[in-house]
Curated annotation (Swiss-Prot):
Residues 24-65 form the CHCH domain. It comes from Schizosaccharomyces pombe (strain 972 / ATCC 24843). A motif (Cx9C motif 1) lies at residues 27-37. One of its GO terms (cellular component) is nucleus. This is Coiled-coil-helix-coiled-coil-helix domain-containing protein C550.01c. Keywords: Cytoplasm, Disulfide bond, Nucleus.
Length: 77
C-alpha cells in the first residue's frame, strides 16, 4: 500500500512502494545518481559507475543481490 506525504507546498502526494523501500533500506542518494545518469544518457551502459555505487551500498546493508544466473537456476528447479 502506498503512503501519502505532504509536498513542500502542502499538497498531498502518494509515495510508491519502491520509494518507500529505498528510504527504509538506505541508498537513496546512490539511486538518485543512477537515475540521473540514465535520464541524461538514456543508456544504462554509460552508468556503470553509478550502478556499482548503488550495488555496493545495497549489498552493504542487505547482502548480495541475486545474479541473473541465480534467478534462472531457481526458475529451473
Amino acid at each position: 500500500m502506498d503512503s501519502i506525504e505532504k509536498t513542500p507546498d502542502g499538497e498531498e502526494e502518494e509515495k510508491d512502494v519502491w520509494d518507500t523501500a529505498l528510504e527504509k533500506g538506505g541508498c537513496v542518494e546512490e539511486h538518485l545518481r543512477l537515475n540521473d545518469c540514465y535520464w541524461d544518457t538514456h543508456d544504462w551502459r554509460k552508468c556503470t559507475e553509478q550502478m556499482e555505487e548503488f550495488r555496493k551500498c545495497w549489498e552493504k546493508r542487505h547482502g548480495p543481490l541475486p545474479s541473473i544466473s541465480d534467478k534462472k537456476n531457481k526458475n529451473l528447479s
